[in-house]
């Protein structure tokens, strides 16, 4: 069993981004810029945004965070996004999810200029991904693909089970795998027999937010398991969606939680923002 070390890979990605940022500054006098919209006072969202701001600083980005109260109107959010769309210093716009209940998330995401949609959530970019065209791709699935690449895991012809069909993780993950010529099964809350699908798969990718959902008897010997789940349990520790202790010995590769997929998400956000800045150049 080999651990896939997301922490060290994310560090490597960030180092490469920092080098390219320095070159972009020297040659084109361009500093990549990321704007983040943070609405309300959800502690987890604030923690994520702080991590993103620190990462931007480390690689030499310009970054700005718009903190807004959860009483804000949809029109005010739209006006702020439109202002950032028009700002030439901003290459990436990120709206921290989830949004308050009175806000239509899809409508907000659709206002973002697709060329600045570094989270890859705009329908334009989703459509390009599905059809196999170059696009901005959601950062977590993109991070998983980077892991496969780094560890030289060949996806062609592999049976892959994606557990979870969210717009943010499951669906883009399935599209990326399909584009890499894997045979993809997507399971979700209405799937009758989850084990029947996961136990046949060469690779299981899970991201549903249910601690310990994937048990030892649900994966085959030698499988590759990618755990995207991050759950804080009663004793305060972070665990994934996989029963790591019992599943890991059966795997050829597995990602730990924490230190697996999580760090890759921010690394790929930086990578996407750099990509946008280079298009500006």
Curated annotation (Swiss-Prot):
Pathway it belongs to?
One-carbon metabolism; tetrahydrofolate interconversion
- Any keyword NADP? yes
Q: From the Swiss-Prot or TrEMBL record, what is one GO molecular function term?
A: methylenetetrahydrofolate dehydrogenase (NADP+) activity
Does NADP show up as a keyword for this record?
yes
Q: Name one GO cellular component term.
A: cytosol
Keyword set, alphabetical order: Amino-acid biosynthesis, Histidine biosynthesis, Hydrolase, Methionine biosynthesis, Multifunctional enzyme, NADP, One-carbon metabolism, Oxidoreductase, Purine biosynthesis
Instruction: Note the subunit structure.
Output: Homodimer.
Q: Record's HAMAP family?
A: THF_DHG_CYH
| The protein's name in its UniProt record | Bifunctional protein FolD
